[in-house]
Amino acid sequence: MSVVHTTNYGNGYSLDQLENERGELYYRACKGSVCRYAEDHYIAVMYLEGMGWDPKQHVHQ
């Protein structure tokens, strides 16, 4: 697994785009040390929202 891109939203929220050994992309949505994985960007963003992230109030870093 390698990290292709990371977006930090502040307050411990982050979204990583990852690539596995087969070259497939997937996503890791995290709040601090708690992370969930998804094959789809939309689902990963939904995971962030489920962890309490509000896209209307995020600070893009």
For each predicted feature, which ranges?
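Short N-terminal "domain-start" leader segments
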Residues: 1-28, 35-36, 58-60
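Short arginine-rich
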Residues: 50-59
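Alpha-helix N-cap recognition
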Residues: 40-41
